Structures are given as C-alpha cells and as structure tokens.
Swiss-Prot record:
This is Uroporphyrinogen decarboxylase. Coproporphyrinogen III binds at residues 34, 36, 38, 83, 161, 216, 336. Belongs to the uroporphyrinogen decarboxylase family. It comes from the Eukaryota. GO terms for biological process: cellular response to arsenic-containing substance; heme A biosynthetic process; heme B biosynthetic process; heme biosynthetic process; heme metabolic process; heme O biosynthetic process; liver development; porphyrin-containing compound biosynthetic process. Coproporphyrinogen I binds at residues 34, 36, 38, 47, 83, 161, 216, 336.
Length: 364
C-alpha cells in the first residue's frame, strides 16, 4: 500500500511540517481552512460543472480544486479537497448537499436498531478509494511545492450529522442520544472510530504528509459530555492511526486536532496524542499557551471575519497574533474556514503579513 511513496517529488518547502514537529523555522508557516473554497472565482468555475459529492468523487476535480489556492497564494501547505461526510456515505448513509442549505440526510439515525443499516466499518476505506486517488494525484501535481494535508471528521461531529440529519443550531437530537441512549451512542462512536482509522492510514499511504481531525461541533458539549463522548475517541483515533502507520512501515505524520469551541478541553487535547492543537478565535493566544506549554504546536486562530477589514488592519491584527503566540511551536491559520464572500486580495494580504511579520519577529 505504501510502496508508491518513494515516487513522489522531493518536498521543497517543509516549513509547515517542521513547525508541526516543534522544530525551529525561519518564519511562521500559514495555510487556511477552506482555502479551496467559493471565495475563489476559479473554484466556482471548476465546481459549476457538477454537484458537490460528484466533485468529491472525481480525483481530477479534487486535485484541481486543491491546487488552485496554492497556485494563487504563497501558502505553506495544501489540504485535499474533500468533505468529512464521505465517511457516513461510505457507511451506507445517503447524504445530499442542498445548495444554500448544506448537507441533508434523508434517513437519519433515530433508534439504536438503525445502526444495523450501517456498513461494516472495516469496509469503509475500500469505499473511499476516490479520496486516496485524489491525494496521490495531487501529491504528484504539487511537485513538492508544499506538503499535502489529509483530513477527516471526528466521531462526535460525524455522529451529530448522522443523527440530526443535517447541521442544526442546538444539536438537541444528537445530545438526546448521549443522555437517553449512552450505550447506543458509544456503539456508534466506536463504529465511526473503526471506520476512521484505516481511512486516515490510507490517506497517508496515498501520499498525505499530515492529518487533521475536525471536531467541528465540540462547542455543543460541556466538559463532562466532551470528556465522555468526544475525547476518548479523539485519543483513540490518534493512538490507532500511529500504531497502524508503524505497522504498515509508513512514515510517521504530524496529526492536528481542531476542536472548534472546545477551549474548555485545551489541556486534555494537548495530551491526546496530536502534535498540533488547532484553535478558534474565541481563545486568547497567551491563555491557550499556558495549559499546553511548549509540548504541542498551536495552530490558528485569527477570526475569519477579520479578513473583511482593510489590508492595513489585517496586517496589524496578524502582527498582534504573532507577538502573542511567539515565533516557535506555532502555525498561523484562521480560527475557522474562509467564507464564500471573502476577497481573495485580503486572503493574500493575510498570508503575506504572516510571512513578513514572522520574519521580522525572529530578527528582533
């Protein structure tokens, strides 16, 4: 499985990987969540031809969409164009993307017996060959320019979609499961963990050079529910992926955990087996550094809406952020994905400001 690895072009810019491992870098590396997104005119053009999940299933389309922001901007990493919901799809759940509304599951999980409808999690990776093909193709096309990040959704976040049938403000149905059906909840979270581990290992075998786990709905859980229903599975994914990579003779990869609005669990996340902890903009950099120290690299956390500000103001905000995080053990990013109405010029200004100010910071 990992035999194709040596055929990839040599990596020219490894700043992102070095920062992830905690090594010193000449400047602070930067990338953006949803950097391949609708804010780019070329993205809208490429995407116009087919519906969302058909695009996800086309390795050529995913490769092109992944490369577009890298061609345009001085990014230090690429992240494969895909979606976290390909995993529930591979578990035999129907998911459609409704324009203007988001994902929809026509038949969400309502009762414990609905879990019997799910495909064997061991078969999931074989259903997701199109993601692996997209990663291999993209890694070749990147020609070593920057590292390629693979990703997946964390078990709790995937569970919310599968039970709610979409994305809802309160996640009341999913949380009802946690309170009323704790055994079934753990069973479902276990199934998802079993599906995710070979999927993430497969991404590395296909050419991914780092992995990010998105716990996008961490904020719906308080610390007690989080430590019961999210954290154990986040830990388990990291532990099993690392063991699996070693067993398969694959290179170890830095892993990133991004638990949005999960600031109440920062200390636990820093000890969950990931090299990098992603932050959203509600966490002050200095406050985030206190509980985690220099044991992990932090990633984030500019408010994406700051990109609506003037380029001058963006520069000032970036400078402040870099000063607060310090020069080492840090990867710059936004605290969430880019929004469709953002100005690509302002995205460029953000990236340039990170590179410029982080070099100056090191000189002083």
């Amino acid at each position: 499985n990992g035999l194709g690895l040596q055929n990839f072009p040599e990596l020219k810019n490894d700043t992102f990987l070095r920062a992830a491992w905690g090594e010193e870098t000449d400047y602070t590396p930067v990338w953006c969540m949803r950097q391949a997104g609708r804010y780019l005119p070329e993205f809208r053009e490429t995407r116009a031809a087919q519906d969302f999940f058909s695009t996800c299933r086309s390795p050529e389309a995913c490769c092109e969409l992944t490369l577009e922001p890298v061609r345009r901007f001085p990014l230090d990493a690429a992240i494969i164009f895909s979606d976290i919901l390909v995993v529930p799809q591979a578990l035999a759940m129907e998911v459609t993307m409704v324009p203007g509304k988001g994902p929809s599951f026509p038949e969400p999980l309502r009762e414990e017996r609905d879990l019997e409808r799910l495909r064997d999690p061991a078969a999931v990776a074989s259903e997701l060959g199109y993601v692996f093909q997209a990663i291999t193709l993209t890694r070749q096309q990147l020609a070593g320019r920057v590292p390629l990040i693979g990703f997946a959704g964390a078990p709790w976040t995937l569970m919310t979609y599968m039970v709610e049938g979409g994305s809802f403000k309160t996640m009341a149905q999913a949380k009802r499961w946690l309170y009323q059906k704790p055994v079934a909840s753990h069973k479902l979270l276990g199934i998802l963990t079993h599906a995710l581990v070979p999927y993430l290992i497969g991404q590395v075998a296909a050419g991914a050079q780092a992995l990010q786990l998105f716990e996008s709905h961490a904020g719906h859980l308080g610390s007690e529910l989080f430590s019961k229903f999210a954290l154990p599975y986040i830990r388990d994914v990291a532990k099993r992926v690392k063991a699996g990579l070693q067993k398969a003779g694959l290179t170890r990869m830095p892993m990133i955990i991004f638990a949005k609005d999960g600031h109440f669990a920062l200390e636990e996340l820093a000890q969950a087996g990931y090299e990098v902890v992603g932050l959203d903009w509600t966490v002050a950099p200095k406050k985030a550094r206190e509980p985690v120290g220099k044991t992990v690299t932090l990633q984030g956390e500019l408010d994406p809406c700051a990109l609506y500000a003037s380029e001058e103001e963006i520069g000032r905000l970036v400078q402040q952020m870099l000063n607060d995080f310090g020069p080492q053990r840090y990867i710059a990013n936004l605290g969430h994905g880019l929004y469709p109405d953002m100005d690509p010029e302002h995205v460029g200004a953000f990236l340039d400001a990170v590179h410029k100010h982080s070099r100056l910071l090191r000189q002083n």
